[in-house]
């Protein structure tokens, strides 16, 4: 029996050192050396201060800003600790009522509802933390943002186009617009205007 315990303890110590210490240390050094921005959370700085992350959505509700997908992390919006699925299923009888309420909130905010509302403006994402919207959702908001900022809609649409990211490697995912980056670009453009 004693002859079995010693090899087990040695194996335990070796595996703990390799998987618990060496591997995480090597991956941390590799990440910091090769992907420093991503390894540190893809933080976005403005004037030397961190204003957010390109990976986590932020609440924007002023008419002069583009709005992202709804957060599903109540009661604190965009709380990464509360991330998780939140949308009702397509057969849930509460889904139409929830979507109608969100459309009414858009109307109350002065949004022109004569065009179809992009689905990502009235539903939350799977995580409830999405930092990006579709180009259609951004285009839908151009008039409201331009009016609130006293800018030409074409100038705002150009900023949307400049902040639209295509499919990864040309085939993965869909084109998307990072709301935080777009709103920072809007602030910079208006300050320069």
From Swiss-Prot:
Subcellular location: Cell inner membrane
Molecular function terms from GO: ATP binding; P-type potassium transmembrane transporter activity
Any one GO CC term of the record: plasma membrane
Membrane topology category: Single-pass membrane protein
Disulfide cysteine pairs (residue numbers): none
Pfam families: KdpC (PF02669)
Keyword Endoplasmic reticulum: no
Domain of life where this protein originates: Bacteria
Swiss-Prot/TrEMBL keywords: ATP-binding, Cell inner membrane, Cell membrane, Ion transport, Membrane, Nucleotide-binding, Potassium, Potassium transport, Transmembrane, Transmembrane helix, Transport
Record's keyword annotation contains Transport: yes
TM regions (residue ranges): 7-27
Role: Part of the high-affinity ATP-driven potassium transport (or Kdp) system, which catalyzes the hydrolysis of ATP coupled with the electrogenic transport of potassium into the cytoplasm. This subunit acts as a catalytic chaperone that increases the ATP-binding affinity of the ATP-hydrolyzing subunit KdpB by the formation of a transient KdpB/KdpC/ATP ternary complex.
HAMAP family found in the cross-reference section: KdpC
Family statement drawn from the similarity comment of this UniProt entry: Belongs to the KdpC family.
Oligomeric and partner information: The system is composed of three essential subunits: KdpA, KdpB and KdpC.
Name of the protein: Potassium-transporting ATPase KdpC subunit
Species this chain originates from: Burkholderia cenocepacia (strain ATCC BAA-245 / DSM 16553 / LMG 16656 / NCTC 13227 / J2315 / CF5610) (Burkholderia cepacia (strain J2315))
